[in-house]
Amino acid sequence: MKIILWLSLFLFLVAGATPVFGVVEDLQIESVESVAEGRDFGRVGPYEKVVGRLTLSLDPETERIVDLNRAPQGSDGRVRFEADIYLLRPVHAERGRVTLFLEIPNRGGKAIVRYFNRGATRTFDPVTSESLGDGFLMEEGYTLAWIGWQFDVPDQNNLMKVDVVPATSGGRVEGLVRADHVFEEESDIFELGHVGHRAYLPTAIDDERHRLTVRSTRLGPGKLVPRESWSSRFPDEVTGEGLAVRLDGGFQKGKVYELVYASADPVVVGVGLAALRDGAAWLRDSEDSPVAVERVLAMGISQTGR
């Protein structure tokens, strides 16, 4: 089937015991509502949507998460953060499978319903009968889940995010950020936050470490673009959304442009992957879980499938 060619599908087994360094401390449910106007999905019956926020904590000495020991800690010495969670579950849990189907959100979105159910619309809130398509996953009784793990997705309704913690303890951290882009059409704007995502802000407009280069091929030699021929644009100095570079004469189609610039105050991005791991394990194992499942099946599309 063509649909399989578009997906990178994988199975993973979450460790049987609660992860040593990760704990889900709380689930704050924000809403529970019926989907598809109460449509019956065969023997399984109707589904409902659950939206909320997970509060998680980690041991700051977890070495696999870079800079976690630089994050602010609570009085008990643990690092806390929150992640979005979105569930589609059978109203009658006993009729469903004991399998949780977790999609690793690509850019905060939701796609498995559209692919597996042949949903007619692309949406971040798949609750209409049209968006749920032929209802395949529901008729099979799967509980569907999405957990936010990216910190840089745009601040839009129903995009899945994780509120990451800053690596600010012990003094300010500075370093270099690299962004590159190949333009399909000529343009005078180079957006650093791809498709509206958040980008790190530069330390200063005129920092001498900022460099823009251009090359004809991916592995070819780079040519330095004179500093006086390009400038920066800062629509939102708080979030970094809309951060861009303008180039006199514009960016050429097919060329590889690379910007390296100085920035500061990094966030601990790795907690997003911990949110996926610990959130999935908690949904499966905890007595406080809002779903009745015994195993987790996960998949990703595009970057999350790689």
Tell where the protein language model's regions lie, with residue ranges.
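Positively charged n-region of N-terminal signal peptides that target proteins for export
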Residues: M1-L5
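Bacterial N-terminal signal peptides
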Residues: W6-G16
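Sec/Tat signal peptide C-region and signal peptidase I cleavage site
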Residues: T18-G22
